[in-house]
């Protein structure tokens, strides 16, 4: 797959770098007409003042505004456009705001403290999840009495179905904010708990996934944290490094299945799609990798579901509840690509995340379903260099730097892409910069690139989406969801019920639908074949 991606990107570079700006854009009437149309839409925009039967929160981990813009360019170019003019699915939501992401104790946050903010409505400390700032990192004794409750938990208490979907392990910081309370985000299994934490009764995150609340749908990675130590992985039985890790010999999947008569566990795409059409399935757990799921471009799409597919399956299951649902969907590996200074991985993950948003938007009605899209934090990721419009987002700036060497438009402030260890910066060319495994250069050496501290965007559509406005604390996201859904502490919301009900269509087409990115790559390669040879 990686070789095909290289050819695809090189082909895009050939096609786009030779492209011309559309002639109509030279005419002022083009821009005036476009703005007038946008103004007309804005004037007709009316808030939907009913309650939200359903709430979906899409969380792009590390998807700061620069990442959103770069993803827009990439998706536009992959569809044969120049790039920046082509809207993402999230761009088309009518309400947008900015969210302040700091933790109580950190100006630049991590994904644990931020998850507490946007999922529970309370800011917490760095590396802690589901607890107030009175709890201290790694101090188990400070957990009890400082737990805070997620909106997902409150939605479940209100009778709604709930689900968690992620491309990371389901025990990772962001999804854990929906169900766990821990003073250390890395306590994935009991093997990670220090002796004092075990002695003081702290539970690992995987155990809390099963024990803390009734979650109807759980989809992502993280198999090894659920099974007893030494249990062979079903997909990689000969690789002992991914065996189960639980020291107390607990099989948490079996424990979860025993709680629900209609519970089904799956670990591959085929079984997932079959479960989607089985009306007897009331609870669905799909764990598709021992730890985090693979990057989309590295997946075997006959075995590994895409985020779009997982989102659609989750929607089919939770939408069976006449009282509605709450669904958390995370594009978690956007963040991991950035931490590695690998922009290709980050941006293609963000593109797939946007595809999942588009699918949810298609399957649900804005009259009864509130959809929010946001990020937990940003990254020290930027793109510049006065590149020509239509230049590949992974391409080079048109002029050289003061050291007479080329540089990529995308650069990082720090991270493993630091390249001055030999005393001078290495040169880079188009072939190198378009390689999916290429690490963009970074100014400061770090084993892992750091988060950025700037505000992130919040996009919204549906009932009460108009409350997304201005610049707010990240905690406001949770309170909008709680108010729109009329769950604690807003059970007296006094909002009328929606008049239209979302109805998810049959999922039989899922098994036959090729993954969007693979399909797109294949189509583009066919189109570009004459220029490549």
UniProtKB/Swiss-Prot annotation:
Molecular function as annotated in GO: alkaline phosphatase activity; magnesium ion binding; zinc ion binding
Positions of disulphide bridges: 140-202, 486-493
Residues annotated as signal peptide: 1-19
Cofactor note: Binds 1 Mg(2+) ion. Binds 2 Zn(2+) ions.
The keyword Acetylation is assigned to this record: no
Binding site for Ca(2+): 235, 288-289, 304
Residues excised as propeptide: 507-533
Residues the entry annotates as binding Zn(2+) 2: 335, 339, 451
EC number(s) stated in the UniProt entry for this protein: 3.1.3.1
Keywords assigned by UniProt, alphabetized: Calcium, Cell membrane, Disulfide bond, Glycoprotein, GPI-anchor, Hydrolase, Lipoprotein, Magnesium, Membrane, Metal-binding, Signal, Zinc
Subunit structure: Homodimer.
Record's function text: Alkaline phosphatase that can hydrolyze various phosphate compounds.
Protein name as annotated: Intestinal-type alkaline phosphatase
């Amino acid at each position: 797959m990686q070789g095909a991606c290289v050819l695809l990107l090189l082909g895009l570079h050939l096609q786009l770098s030779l492209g011309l700006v559309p002639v109509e854009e030279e005419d002022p009437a083009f821009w005036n007409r476009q703005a007038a149309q946008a103004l007309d839409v804005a004037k007709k925009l009316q808030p939907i003042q009913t309650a939200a039967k359903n709430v979906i929160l899409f969380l792009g981990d590390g998807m700061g505004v620069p990442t959103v813009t770069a993803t827009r360019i990439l998706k536009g170019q992959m569809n044969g456009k120049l790039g920046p003019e082509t809207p993402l699915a999230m761009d088309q939501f009518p309400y947008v705001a900015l969210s302040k992401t700091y933790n109580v104790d950190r100006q630049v946050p991590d994904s644990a403290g931020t998850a507490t903010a946007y999922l529970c409505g309370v800011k917490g400390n760095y590396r802690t999840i589901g607890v107030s700032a009175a709890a201290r990192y790694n101090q188990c004794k400070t957990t009890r009495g400082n737990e805070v409750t997620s909106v997902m938990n409150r939605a479940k208490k209100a009778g709604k179905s709930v689900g968690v979907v992620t491309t990371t392990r389901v025990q990772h910081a962001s999804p854990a904010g929906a169900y766990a309370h821990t003073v250390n985000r890395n306590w994935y299994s009991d093997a990670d708990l220090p002796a004092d934490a075990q002695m003081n009764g702290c539970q690992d995150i995987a155990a809390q996934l099963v024990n803390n609340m009734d979650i109807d749908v759980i989809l992502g990675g993280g198999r090894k944290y659920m099974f007893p130590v030494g249990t062979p992985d079903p997909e990689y039985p000969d690789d002992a490094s991914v065996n189960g890790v639980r020291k107390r010999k607990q099989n948490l999947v079996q424990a979860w299945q025993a709680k629900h008569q209609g519970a089904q566990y799956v670990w591959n795409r085929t079984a997932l799609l079959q479960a989607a059409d089985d009306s007897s399935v009331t609870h669905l757990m799909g764990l598709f990798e021992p730890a985090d799921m693979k990057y989309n471009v590295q997946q075997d799409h006959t075995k590994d579901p895409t985020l779009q597919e997982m989102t659609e399956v989750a929607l089919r299951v939770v939408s069976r509840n006449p009282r509605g649902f709450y669904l958390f969907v995370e594009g978690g590996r956007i963040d991991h690509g950035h931490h590695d200074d690998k922009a290709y991985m980050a941006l293609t993950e963000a593109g797939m995340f946007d595809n999942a948003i588009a699918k949810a938007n298609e399957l649900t009605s804005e009259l009864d379903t509130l959809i929010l899209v946001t990020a937990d934090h940003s990254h020290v990721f930027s793109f510049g260099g006065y590149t020509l419009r239509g230049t590949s987002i992974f391409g080079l700036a048109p002029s050289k730097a003061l050291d007479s060497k080329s540089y990529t438009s995308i650069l990082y402030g720090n991270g493993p892409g630091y390249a001055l260890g030999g005393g001078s910066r290495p040169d880079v060319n188009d072939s190198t910069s378009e390689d999916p495994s290429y690490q963009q250069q970074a100014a400061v050496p770090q084993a892992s690139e750091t988060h950025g501290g700037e505000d992130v965007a919040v996009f919204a559509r549906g009932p009460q989406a108009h409350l997304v406005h201005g610049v707010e604390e990240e905690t406001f996201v949770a309170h909008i969801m709680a108010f729109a859904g009329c769950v604690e502490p807003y059970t007296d919301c006094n909002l009328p019920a929606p008049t239209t009900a979302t109805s998810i269509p049959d999922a039989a087409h899922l098994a036959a639908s090729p993954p969007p990115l693979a399909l797109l790559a294949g189509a583009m390669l066919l189109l570009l074949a004459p220029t490549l040879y």
